[in-house]
Curated annotation (Swiss-Prot):
Entry's Gene Ontology cellular component terms: endoplasmic reticulum membrane
Domain remark from Swiss-Prot or TrEMBL: The leucine-rich hydrophobic amino acid N-terminal region probably helps to anchor the protein to the microsomal membrane.
Molecular-function annotations in GO: 17-hydroxyprogesterone 21-hydroxylase activity; heme binding; iron ion binding; progesterone 21-hydroxylase activity; steroid 21-monooxygenase activity; steroid binding
Record-stated family: Belongs to the cytochrome P450 family.
This protein's name: Steroid 21-hydroxylase
Binding site for progesterone: 231
Cofactor(s) the protein requires to work: heme b
Reaction it catalyzes: progesterone + reduced [NADPH--hemoprotein reductase] + O2 = 21-hydroxyprogesterone + oxidized [NADPH--hemoprotein reductase] + H2O + H(+); 17alpha-hydroxyprogesterone + reduced [NADPH--hemoprotein reductase] + O2 = 11-deoxycortisol + oxidized [NADPH--hemoprotein reductase] + H2O + H(+)
Organism: Rattus norvegicus
Amino acid sequence: MLLPGLLLLLLLLLLAGTRWLWGQWKLWKLRLPPLAPGFLHFLQPNLPVYLFGLAQKLGPIYRIRLGLQDVVVLNSNKTIEEALIQKWVDFAGRPQILDGKMNFDLSMGDYSLTWKAHKKLSRSALVLGMRDSMEPLVEQLTQEFCERMRAQAGASVAIHKEFSLLTCSIISCLTFGDKQDSTLLNATHSCVRDLLKAWNHWSVQILDIIPFLRFFPNPGLWKLKQFQESRDHIVMQELKRHKDSLVAGQWKDMIDYMLQGVEKQRDARDPGQLHERHVHMSVVDLFVGGTETTAATLSWAVAFLLHHPEIQKRLQEELDLKLAPSSQLLYKNRMQLPLLMATIAEVLRLRPVVPMALPHRATKASSISGYDIPKDTIIIPNIQGANLDEMVWELPSKFWPDRFLESGKSPRIPTFGCGARVCLGEPLARLEFFVVLARLLQTFTLLPPPDGTLPSLQPLPYTGINLLIPPFQVRLQPRNLAPQDQGQKSSTG
């Protein structure tokens, strides 16, 4: 009995070895991007900048080892746009990751007819379903935020947490409808922050590099699953509440809109059937992808303006000239505030929402910049690295909003990704940047705390999705514009 078992084992080893050699032989025939030596690249503390440094030696496209596979890193706008715009179908896939709800997830779901239907419904719910209410909602909640900050009477404030609560509240109203009571909102906000903190922990991130470690005891992974259960409980309760009160042809929020969209698609028997779980994961993606990311960008903007009070003063002069405090702030008229829009663009260039876009997967054999890219290769666009390219940007590390005021001088920045995988929440995030910063600078002067300490502009060690700023405090000094001056200002409405 022992001999047949050994023969079977040898046969399996022979087949595995033959398959590996066949795969290597096929790769030897290809013109692959250069391979960066070493195995510990993803353990670097400031990963996007480190990867861009490798590009200075190897070129804008190269390979690095990630566990047992190679990953291709793109470090220039040209290579990113070729892959994600010109050849978007070839690179629209997603690799399998730790969170396994791949058939229902939007941000990490693989490319398919179902995924396309899911993306179309979710984007329609945000852009069309909430078209008339999204802008007034952001304005209202921002005004309430400013009133809360005014009550601080110039005291030092941990601004990131306040921004995070604001963005969570906006998403909550868009998805769940009526404003949540403070207890439920705080519970939702804490759940989202805890979930992201657990996800970004090294003990979880390493599982995508060394997958077999997930079979060993891992307190970090256990915490992540606990927070996922809490998240799902909150969303499922809201789905049930919405189904119980749903009226055909009417909607008050995104969940209503998407639930009816799923029913219509089911009745029409369209390809790529959607289910209630897809609605669930759309809500999850909005909270996870739109709370801390937007709050982090707003925090970076405040930090840069504390370091550059002269730019803050120019922004306030622009707002005082073009926008009366009591006037309606319309996003369609945003170009009446060119310096504000340039400042937002510069913050997004230096500190992009997601510095390294979520990984893509080659759905077929293709090429980028003349290099062969085999099917199923993982592609990582290094957006922050591309934004630091001296061949494209003058003084790329300098905070200089005026670069965007020079006509024709500023290339497109793929801050929210591009092509089929462009971020679902981009319209909401851009609206929030515009409204929150406009109202904040119109209402307050940003000052350092009494001891004069300025925030660090160096990101925390990069281990997850977001580029996080070290905690800091700011004083929001009310400006108290004179009523007679306010009446002389024009309106962007």
